[in-house]
Amino acid sequence: MAVFKLRVLTPEKIFFEGDAEQLIAKTTSGYVGILKGHAPYVASIVPSEMKIRSDGSFRSAAISDGIVKVSEDSMVTVLTSAIEWSDEIDVARAERSKARAEKQLKAETSRTEFDLAERQLKRAVNRISVANKK
């Protein structure tokens, strides 16, 4: 299968950089599959499972909000605030984060605090879901 260059970046690190055969990500308009030669493209990624096919096999990761960009030279870049491989997710920690977010959502808080708790809940639920697909 043909390969393209893929970079997945967070503010803290380069999560993945190398050749990929396919990228599957969930955007605001649904799932997108990217192969070599994909047309230039930009989309917002929602918290979900992202799959990278490299060396003939898929590897899954839990990704937070982000952006995927396919440039004219077929370079694919994913920018996200947080991402982790499914086999590296600390499920107990994610469960604690979920419980904290649910508690915060039930409390009387400002709209900003509510929105933050809602995002934290979505991220925790996504991490748990992706980890349990191993």
Swiss-Prot record:
Pfam families: ATP-synt_DE, ATP-synt_DE_N. Keywords: ATP synthesis, Cell membrane, CF(1), Hydrogen ion transport, Ion transport, Membrane, Transport. InterPro entries: ATP_F1_dsu/esu_C_sf, ATP_synth_F1_dsu/esu, ATP_synth_F1_dsu/esu_N, ATP_synth_F1_esu_C, ATPsynth_dsu/esu_N. One of its GO terms (molecular function) is proton-transporting ATP synthase activity, rotational mechanism. Its main location: membrane. It is a peripheral membrane protein. It comes from the Bacteria. It is found in: Cell membrane. NCBIfam families: ATP_synt_epsi. Belongs to the ATPase epsilon chain family. F-type ATPases have 2 components, CF(1) - the catalytic core - and CF(0) - the membrane proton channel. CF(1) has five subunits: alpha(3), beta(3), gamma(1), delta(1), epsilon(1). CF(0) has three main subunits: a, b and c. Produces ATP from ADP in the presence of a proton gradient across the membrane. This is ATP synthase epsilon chain.
